[in-house]
From Swiss-Prot:
Membrane spanning residue stretches: 175-195, 215-235
Annotated protein name in UniProt: Transmembrane protein DDB_G0272716
Source organism, top-level taxon: Eukaryota
Cell compartment(s), UniProt: Membrane
Membrane topology: Multi-pass membrane protein
Main location: membrane
Protein's organism: Dictyostelium discoideum (Social amoeba)
Annotated GO CC locations: membrane
Length: 351
C-alpha cells in the first residue's frame, strides 16, 4: 500500500492508541486558523481573505460529493457486515457445539467439523474481498469527482504561481522606494513605486496599489532636512512592503490548509477502509490456518471485535466529514456577510 501522509496519519489513529480522531484533527485545526484569520483581520484584509474563500467555495460542494459517495458505500458495507457477522456466529456456534468431540480427538468427527468450518470460512473470505472491492471500486461518479478534485488542485497551483509573482513584485516596490530616496536627494525628479496586481487562475488574488513618491529637492532647502524626509518616506514604503509580504504568506498558508483538507478527506476514507479489511482478512486467514491444525480453542471474539472496530471507524469518519462540511459552510456564510458589508460600504461611499 502506498505510504503517503494520509496513511501515516491513519496508522497513528490505530485503535491501540488513545484516540481514533487524529486523522481529522489536522483539518479542524486548519479550519480554526481560517476562522481566526476572518475575525482578527481588519476590513481590508478580511476582503482579501473573503475573495479567496468565495472562490474556494467549490470545496464545500466537493466535500458534499465526497460525503455522499462515502455514505453510499457505507450503506452497502453495513448490509455486508450483517451477513458476515451471521457467518461468524454460525462458525462460532458450530465449533462450540462440537468442542467435546474435537477435544476427544475423534478424527472422523474432527474431519467432518473442519470441512463444515472450511465451507463457512471460504465464503467469509470471499465476502471480505467483495466488501473491499465494493468500497474501492471506481464508477462514473467517482471518476467525475476525481476530475473535480484534479481541477481544484490545478487551480490551486495557478493561485500559488500568482502569489509567487506578487511576492517577487515586492522587490520592485522596495527597489523603487530606495531609488526614490537617491533621486530625490540628488534633486533629479520624481519616481513612482510600482504596485503589483495579480489575477491568476480562479481568483483575483491581491492588488497592491500604486504609490507615488514625488520629491524635488528645493535649491534653498537644507540638504539634511531633505534627506531626512526622504529616508522617512523610504522607511514607510519598506514597512508597507513588509506588511504585503506577510499578507501574501498568510494567503499562501490559507490555500495550503484547503489543499491539505481536500487531499486528506478524499484519501482517508478509502485508505482507512483498506487498512481495516486487510487486517480483518489476515485475522480470518490466521484463524483458518490454526483451525486446520486444531491448535486453537475456536475463539472468534477477535474477529467479532474487528467488525465492531470497522463500524465505529466508519461512523467516526462519516461524522467528521459531515462536521467539516458544515464548518466549511459556516466559513462561506461568514464570507458572504463580509461581501454584503463591503457592497453596503461602497454604496454609502458613492453617496
Amino acid at each position: 500500500m502506498e505510504n503517503n501522509n494520509s496513511l501515516t496519519i491513519i496508522k497513528k489513529a490505530d485503535p491501540k492508541t488513545k484516540s481514533n480522531g487524529e486523522a481529522f484533527q489536522i483539518a479542524f485545526d486548519s479550519m480554526d486558523k481560517i476562522k481566526t484569520m476572518l475575525t482578527q483581520q481588519n476590513d481590508k484584509e478580511k476582503l482579501v481573505l473573503k475573495k479567496l474563500m468565495i472562490e474556494m467555495s467549490i470545496n464545500n460542494s466537493l466535500l458534499n460529493e465526497l460525503l455522499t459517495s462515502f455514505s453510499t458505500r457505507v450503506n452497502i458495507i453495513d448490509v455486508e457486515i450483517i451477513v458476515l457477522e451471521s457467518q461468524i456466529s454460525t462458525i462460532e456456534r458450530l465449533t462450540l457445539e462440537n468442542k467435546k468431540e474435537i477435544q476427544s480427538n475423534d478424527q472422523e468427527k474432527i474431519k467432518e467439523i473442519s470441512s463444515m468450518i472450511d465451507k463457512l470460512i471460504d465464503p467469509l473470505l470471499k465476502n471480505i474481498d467483495g466488501l473491499t472491492n465494493k468500497f474501492t471500486e471506481k464508477n462514473v461518479n467517482d471518476e467525475e469527482l476525481k476530475k473535480k478534485i484534479d481541477v481544484f488542485f490545478e487551480n490551486s497551483k495557478k493561485l500559488f504561481q500568482g502569489i509567487d509573482k506578487a511576492e517577487k513584485s515586492q522587490f520592485l516596490t522596495k527597489f523603487s522606494s530606495l531609488f526614490g530616496v537617491i533621486s530625490g536627494f540628488l534633486g533629479i525628479g520624481s519616481v513612482t513605486a510600482i504596485g503589483a496586481t495579480e489575477a491568476v487562475g480562479v481568483t483575483s488574488l491581491i492588488a497592491v496599489g500604486a504609490t507615488s513618491l514625488s520629491v524635488v529637492a528645493p535649491i534653498c532647502a537644507p540638504v539634511l532636512l531633505t534627506f531626512g524626509c526622504l529616508v522617512g518616506a523610504f522607511i514607510s514604503f519598506y514597512k508597507q512592503s513588509v506588511a504585503r509580504d506577510k499578507k501574501l504568506k498568510t494567503l499562501k498558508s490559507l490555500l495550503s490548509y484547503y489543499m491539505e483538507n481536500i487531499e486528506l478527506i478524499s484519501q482517508v476514507t478509502d485508505e482507512t477502509t483498506k487498512l481495516i479489511y486487510h487486517e480483518l482478512k489476515e485475522k480470518v486467514l490466521e484463524f483458518k490456518k490454526l483451525e486446520a491444525n486444531l491448535k486453537i480453542d475456536f475463539d472468534l471474539s477477535p474477529i467479532k471485535d474487528q467488525f465492531k472496530s470497522i463500524t465505529s471507524k466508519q461512523n467516526l469518519i462519516k461524522d467528521k466529514v459531515e462536521e467539516i462540511a458544515n464548518y466549511q459552510l459556516d466559513l462561506i456564510q461568514e464570507c458572504q456577510k463580509l461581501k454584503k458589508k463591503s457592497l453596503k460600504n461602497k454604496t454609502i461611499n458613492k453617496k
